[in-house]
Amino acid sequence: EALTHFQSRDAVFLSSAREGGVVIWNSPELYDQLHLIQLLSWYNSEAGRHCQPPELVLVPFLLGLATEEHDLPECLNQRQVVSTEQLQVAEEAWYALTASNPRMLAAMLKQDLSCLPYLKSGLQRLAEEYPDLNGINRTERQILSILSGGESAPGSVFRDSQQLESPQFMGDSSFWLVIKRMVESDTPLIALADG
């Protein structure tokens, strides 16, 4: 299902890129950052270099939660053509993210990424999903902390975990997969009350 979604997204994107006039809306959450570096990396590739560069709208709020007070038409008026520097940084970030060695991501975080203002914080948060010396990642630590505080209702655990994130880090489906992995691993981190 996810593959079909991305294939459909890519087909729409490629068609639009060839026609020109692409405007990418981007907000701080990691999901948007990953889409942004993937798309801009394509524009910086051999296939994308002949296309008109896209325009970028950077907004400091979650697009899915936008209200009238966010004045989306004014945000659109602030759009700017993506710069060569932004294309290069995006390509390097995408390469580091998709590399088999996580040290490339760590090295990327030492670079100046300010031309894509939300990228560094998104990649830093993603890097926290690598296990620490105890073998667990940040999301798992947050879940264990919330559970040890007495909360056990699944929706509340998700909500409480999201309150520890700025900006929002993952959606509910991804979160439930983390919990499932914690319950079903060879050495479970969570035991369900009903077994």
What residue ranges belong to the model's regions?
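Long, hydrophobic/aromatic-enriched structural stretches that serve as scaffold segments
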Residues: 2-45
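Short secondary-structure subsegments characteristic of cysteine-rich extracellular domains
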Residues: 40-48, 178, 182
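Short amphipathic alpha-helical elements of helix-turn-helix/winged-helix folds
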Residues: 142-150, 160, 178
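Short acidic, hydrophobic short linear motifs in intrinsically disordered regions
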Residues: 151-162, 171
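A conserved mid-domain beta-alpha-beta active-site/ligand-binding segment of alpha/beta enzyme cores
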Residues: 71-148
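Conserved beta-strand -> loop -> alpha-helix junction used to position metal-binding or nucleic-acid-contacting
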Residues: 45-75
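A short acidic (Asp/Glu
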Residues: 32-40, 65-71, 169
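Charge-enriched amphipathic alpha-helical scaffolds
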Residues: 162-194
